[in-house]
From Swiss-Prot:
It is a multi-pass membrane protein. Does not bind to cimetidine and tripolidine. Shows modest affinity for thioperamide, imetit, N-alpha-methylhistamine and R(-)-alpha-methylhistamine. Isoform 4 is unable to bind to iodoproxyfan while isoforms 1 and 3 bind it with high affinity. Residues 61-70, 130-156, 218-359, 417-445 are cytoplasmic. Glycans are attached at residue 11. The keyword Cell membrane applies. Changing residue 280 to V: In a Shy-Drager syndrome patient; uncertain significance. PANTHER family: 5-HYDROXYTRYPTAMINE RECEPTOR, HISTAMINE H3 RECEPTOR. This is Histamine H3 receptor. Residues 237-260, 288-336 are annotated as: Disordered. Residues 1-39, 92-108, 178-196, 381-395 are extracellular. The modification Phosphoserine is found at residue 439. It comes from Homo sapiens.
Length: 445
């Protein structure tokens, strides 16, 4: 995202660079340095174009990727692809020769597209983080909206419109509003490049606000996961506690006349390890349920039906297991099994959300590292009119900004199982193991 005249390493002002270019001089690079820089720039172009093209092709090859949240990743890939296919190639001869040779019309188009793509890339990062924030903090309503692709398309279009409005009108109309162009012949940069007030306002909307937003979203996701983890652990401790749940606690003891038969039956129902998993649970619950004085029907209704018979007392757990009518213990057992199932579901969702948080943290961190140097140097450079920031530091900062477009496609397969599967399907189909779609665990989904 070139935002300044590409001054030579020894020339701090655009005028001196313009004079050197007008005299036919290059930027002062030796032949060896020119070859090295050209090779590095070509490598960045290839990596950016191929990486993001692979992401876009993955959406064509794998229909499982076409979910609402993944459309936002596609939008980001489109922005990054165009950066590598259009913006960087036009800048390479400019930076190597120090002179723009493509005319004023293409210069305007290049500036509009360059600012548009880089700004939309930042806004897409915000949209992706916001989408994951909703998926974690408002899971029910979020899942209900997953089939509404029109909503996703509207959000994607809004990103492009806002990105254009931030810089596009200023690039196209600044010279007419100011009464003429101040750009020297043979150069291509925005008219407002040294307008500190405009740049601080635009930078606030382009970087500082998005960065604070994604930091807030990811911090909220992290705190939500921590809270749910504590709740799950507390629930597990309560379920494994020495006391049974309230609905399974015994009723007051039966009348003294049958105390002995109840005590014996209950005692024989206690050794859970003698039964299988299902039988042990039923047996244990059954012994407790008989205290309710009528949990179901005839054979298991009440301890008073046996007036002290020891043999009847020993048969009680077996009759409970084979009873034809459900007792209160059956409902309690079903509730416990449901709690176990919910615990596994919650554990899976927590694991998935942790992956989401980690992957977003990586993307956001790289976003900050790539954008912060450029934004800060641009503001400082505008404040001192280009005299307080060495040229090579500034150029390094916006090459770092462009490098973000090459890095983003690498991040997707590292955190997303379906992207890895789609990439394998495209690049190494013979290594793709046939798996049912239901077994895929998504990092983003």
């Amino acid at each position: 995202m070139e935002r300044a005249p590409p001054d030579g390493p020894l020339n701090a002002s655009g005028a001196l660079a313009g004079e050197a270019a007008a005299a036919g001089g290059a930027r002062g690079f030796s032949a060896a340095w020119t070859a090295v820089l050209a090779a590095l720039m070509a490598l960045l172009i290839v990596a950016t174009v191929l990486g993001n093209a692979l992401v876009m092709l993955a959406f064509v090859a794998d229909s499982s990727l076409r979910t609402q949240n993944n459309f936002f990743l596609l939008n980001l890939a489109i922005s990054d692809f165009l950066v590598g296919a259009f913006c960087i190639p036009l800048y390479v001869p400019y930076v190597l020769t120090g002179r723009w040779t493509f005319g004023r019309g293409l210069c305007k188009l290049w500036l509009v597209v360059d600012y548009l793509l880089c700004t939309s890339s930042a806004f897409n990062i915000v949209l992706i983080s916001y989408d994951r924030f909703l998926s974690v903090t408002r899971a029910v309503s979020y899942r209900a909206q997953q089939g509404d692709t029109r909503r996703a398309v509207r959000k994607m279009l809004l990103v492009w419109v806002l990105a254009f409005l931030l810089y596009g009108p200023a690039i196209l109309s600044w010279e007419y509003l100011s009464g003429g162009s101040s750009i020297p012949e043979g150069h291509c940069y925005a008219e407002f490049f040294y307008n500190w007030y405009f740049l601080i306002t635009a930078s606030t909307l382009e970087f500082f606000t998005p960065f604070l937003s994604v930091t807030f979203f990811n911090l909220s996701i992290y705190l939500n996961i921590q809270r749910r983890t504590r709740l799950r652990l507390d629930g597990a401790r309560e379920a494994a506690g020495p006391e049974p749940p309230p609905e399974a606690q015994p009723s007051p003891p039966p009348p003294p006349g049958c105390w002995g038969c109840w005590q014996k039956g209950h005692g024989e129902a206690m050794p859970l390890h003698r039964y299988g998993v299902g039988e042990a649970a039923v047996g244990a619950e059954a012994g407790e349920a008989t205290l309710g004085g009528g949990g179901g029907g005839g054979s298991v209704a009440s301890p008073t039906s046996s007036s002290g018979s020891s043999s009847r007392g020993t048969e009680r757990p077996r009759s409970l297991k084979r009873g034809s009518k459900p007792s209160a213990s059956s409902a309690s057992l079903e509730k416990r099994m449901k709690m176990v199932s919910q615990s596994f579901t919650q554990r899976f969702r927590l694991s998935r959300d942790r992956k989401v948080a980690k992957s977003l943290a990586v993307i956001v961190s790289i976003f900050g590292l790539c954008w912060a140097p450029y934004t800060l140097l641009m503001i400082i450079r505008a404040a001192c009119h280009g005299h307080c920031v060495p040229d090579y530091w500034y150029e390094t900062s916006f090459w770092l900004l462009w490098a973000n477009s090459a890095v983003n496609p690498v991040l997707y397969p590292l955190c997303h199982h379906s992207f890895r599967r789609a990439f394998t399907k495209l690049l190494c189909p013979q290594k793709l193991k046939i798996q049912p779609h239901s077994s895929l665990e998504h990092c983003w989904k």
